[in-house]
UniProtKB/Swiss-Prot annotation:
InterPro entries: Leu-bd, Leu_Ile_Val-bd, Peripla_BP_I. Keywords: Amino-acid transport, Signal, Transport. Residues 1-23 form the signal peptide. Gene3D superfamilies: 3.40.50.2300. Transmembrane segments: none annotated. This is Leu/Ile/Val-binding protein homolog 1.
Length: 371
């Protein structure tokens, strides 16, 4: 029999679609269910579902149970707007999502116009919370923070290196690459190459030839794991021995599946891993017993629901405007990420980014290990 953590939440989702009055508060989960970033969508969905089940088991929020509805944005901005409009039409009050910054930013504007509060576990582009909207929150950090850490690390550890900054032309990828480049330039280091590639590209031979010709020995990648894995593998196949460094867009075990053994030694920034917090040991075990590894954004999504529920309780209301006000004024909230507070923009007060290295474990599998 297949184990599951989420039977109660699955029932709530069915009821929500069926139009029953069982649940009074409808939460939308806007994620890439399909497409190249579906692995991150699964993380966000599993985390939110588990946290919602915990909230419902404790009586819901202000006496009202939570139901969920899921929208597949396919990591596409236009589809994200369609999902946002559908959520608004369905009476969604709160959204957990989206993942991609390029989807989250335009969707947030639809939500603001329709009185919906949004908490993103993965949108790191600063613009998301710099729009001056009342409804934008995130449980992750920002690329101006992450890029600063990456740029300083490269400067400190790869002096006199020839550095290529490569990005995927998206608000997330190019935004992160530009923040890293900005920090390097502030420190007096000029990149050797600055290149953009297209999302979905498969053959990076021309890029790698250019990197080799320029004598590049450090490649910083602003983008996600599908392209990163191919670049890493093709660099190895074509004899380019350069250190590959990236950000939180490659924190999926799928990276190792795509890159193969060449992934070993890859570096990336991300927040401190909440799986390593002893306070989360029981929860992490529940996920693993159900056959799901709660990596990357799983617990960031869980914390989003925890913040929402506690803010609603503090506000004494499930009205999104009142909850948004409480999120900014009534913290900190007890979450799997620790005590979490939000500033006036909706950005969280979190520990800084740290560096991870991809290494082969005793089980023969590659994983990212905090340095």
């Amino acid at each position: 029999m297949r184990k599951t953590l989420f039977s109660g939440v699955a029932l709530a989702a069915v009821i929500a679609f069926g139009g029953s009055a069982w649940a009074d508060v409808l939460v939308g989960i806007g994620i890439p269910v399909t497409g190249p970033n579906a692995v991150y969508g699964a993380q966000i969905q599993k985390g939110a579902e588990a946290a919602i089940k915990e909230v419902n088991d404790a009586g819901g929020i202000n006496g009202e149970k939570i139901a969920i509805t899921i929208g597949d944005d396919v990591s596409d901005p236009k589809q994200g707007i369609s999902v946002a409009n559908k959520f608004a039409a369905d009476g969604v009050k709160f959204v957990i999502g989206h993942f991609n910054s390029g989807v989250t930013i335009p969707a947030s504007q639809v939500y603001a116009e329709n009185g919906i509060l949004e908490i993103s576990p993965g949108a790191t582009n600063p613009q998301y919370t710099e729009q001056g909207l009342w409804n934008t929150f995130r449980t992750c950090g920002r690329d101006d923070q992450q890029g600063t850490v990456a740029g300083q690390y490269i400067f400190d550890h790869f002096k006199d290196a020839k550095i290529a900054v490569v990005h995927d032309k998206t608000p997330y990828g190019q935004g992160l690459a530009d923040e890293t480049k900005k920090k390097l330039n502030e420190l007096g280091t000029k990149e050797t190459l600055y290149e953009g590639v297209n999302v979905g590209e498969k053959d990076f031979s021309a890029l790698i030839a250019k990197l080799k010709q320029a004598g590049v020995n450090v490649v910083y990648w602003g983008g996600l794991h599908p392209e990163a894995g191919l670049i890493i593998r093709q660099m190895a196949d074509q004899g380019l021995k350069a250190q590959f460094i990236s950000g939180d867009g490659i924190v999926s075990n799928e990276l190792a599946s795509i890159a193969g053994p060449a992934v070993e030694g890859t570096l990336n920034t991300f927040g401190p891993d909440p799986r390593n917090n002893p306070d989360n040991a029981e929860l992490v075990k529940k996920f693993r017993d159900a056959g799901f590894e709660p990596e990357a954004y799983t617990l960031y999504s869980y914390a989003a629901v925890q913040s929402l529920a506690q803010a609603a309780k503090a506000a004494g209301s499930n009205d999104p405007q009142e909850v948004a006000k409480a999120m900014k004024e009534k913290g900190p909230f007890k979450t799997v990420l620790g005590d979490l507070s939000y500033d006036e923009k909706g950005d969280p007060k979190l520990p800084g980014y740290v560096m991870y290295k991809w290494e082969k474990g005793a089980d023969g599998k590659y994983n990212y290990i905090q340095q």
